[in-house]
């Protein structure tokens, strides 16, 4: 019989939660003399932040049943004491509480100063016989893997746990039995980095004056879970808006004044630093389209970088290094046509460049990129052709009323009805019969009814 975490109530797990002499502890509260026996298996290598892959992040290949544990302090080791480290899951007996923590190396990101910063790793728990190391035996020395098991579990057989289907089963917030010591410098996803608050609640039962208060405090700590609430993102957004002095309940409207300010702010930047958007269009930033500026048409000229198709084009844009070192550059002095003639004239230079961006059909989104490029390259030519094919609307002369046309300087009023059109047609037999009756003399009908 396979077990599904969170699907059944486990009396053994519940009784285990009620037993014990305390709740979850933190590493800075633990005693120096901890039981770190190995039960006959090899000592696990300590997993540190320095052992993560230096080149970017890796993809978690399998779905864990529990939320992750994230490192927030460098140089801290991820480890649990003997018999600890297996999360609590309703429906899973203690005999199946065995598995390993898998280190997920997250990708790096670029900071404001242009440097690459590597995110600290995040650890996910998988039951023995599941996950990325399903075929490995318990205790195998693997970089980025830390084996854990309860004292009642048989580590020689895989755990009888089904794999999680993310479409039907949500991840369970990670919780541990009472007395578990978390690795220092780590926090459970969804619980925040509130270690001081957790330590204060852990000490609260010890400071309580009676056993009853300790029981009530422990009961409250048992029922609370560090899961992510649905409105947590809204609360964070409200706090950020409050710091900025804005009301989160009122929608931010872009008025003509704010749009004008945004447009002026963009136009005050140098030409090569402008980013056109809804408030400042492409033509306002860079002028009309032509042979020297031949990209853009339709909605992209109106929306600029706000166009939904623009981000995929931005993937083709060269970096600053590729621009300077991968292009042919030429410095030329040009005539200064701007400025007040009374002011001192400035020397104006142009850094002209000539290069190419090479890509092939293996590029992600290749078909979409080709479609967008074909729609916007030299689009101004098609627009001009379309304008030439459309006959211009005749302009109405001043003082001329609608519905009048001029022919040889004679104004003829437009007909207002079919009767006024006065179209000639031949008389039918019915018409002739009616005319004859009209010519006959009138005779009064004297017949009685």
Curated annotation (Swiss-Prot):
SUPFAM superfamilies linked: Coronavirus RNA-binding domain, Nucleocapsid protein dimerization domain
Gene Ontology molecular function: any one: RNA binding
Positions annotated to bind RNA: 106, 122, 164
Region of interest (Disordered), ranges: 1-55, 158-231, 266-297, 387-449
Location of region: RNA-binding: 52-194
Comp. bias regions, Basic residues: 266-276
GO CC terms of this entry: host cell endoplasmic reticulum-Golgi intermediate compartment; host cell Golgi apparatus; ribonucleoprotein complex; viral nucleocapsid
Similarity field: Belongs to the betacoronavirus nucleocapsid protein family.
Subunit and interaction comment: Homooligomer. Both monomeric and oligomeric forms interact with RNA. Interacts with protein M. Interacts with NSP3; this interaction serves to tether the genome to the newly translated replicase-transcriptase complex at a very early stage of infection.
Name under which the protein is recorded: Nucleoprotein
